[in-house]
């Protein structure tokens, strides 16, 4: 389960910036979407994700603020797609604890590398590793461009393999994406295609994670509308939690 909890720290399509204060001070002109994270039974709003798109050439989030229901910011992330859309550079910080994640896309004459830095929520140790870049690698919010790149395969019902970066492992793990019934992505207000994310290979055999992750994309815009699974953010008691996130775009 520990691998599962850390795996989805890199999963959601969320981006943000580092700020020193714990409260919002944003340029609402660039507000692109708001994701409302509910408890799985929709009994409570747990937090909201304020997504900002500051690059007019991209239909992608470039930063996000994670806000409590009272509006206070408890975590933020910045994202840079300039070197790779599916393996972007990210900077993530959680103000409630010591958790942080950084990635850097490195290029030289021979091959590209990804530098990964990770610090756990309950540790003062910051760890780094260099990984060889592959086209199948997904880093954090690079999941959206990956889905769009393989859109026709996915909506046709084909299984698409990927290597998802797991910052806590300083490594990637193999996953498969495949289309599933839209009822798994309940909460969407528009027509969507629903996909399920599962572990691949030996990870599937040993039951690497128990609960599937469902992601729903709007059929025309190809934007994420629903996320149903374990959150990339722990609760205020540093415990993992499942969420149902619905997105509204502006």
Report the location of each language-model feature.
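Bacterial N-terminal signal peptides
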Residues: 9-18
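N-terminal secretory signal peptides that target proteins for export/translocation
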Residues: 1-4
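Sec/Tat signal peptide C-region and signal peptidase I cleavage site
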Residues: 19-25
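Acidic, serine/threonine-rich low-complexity disordered tracts
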Residues: 25-83, 92-94, 100-107, 163-250
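Contiguous hydrophobic, core-forming segments of folded domains
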Residues: 72-155
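Solvent-exposed helix/loop surface patches that form functional interfaces
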Residues: 117-196, 203
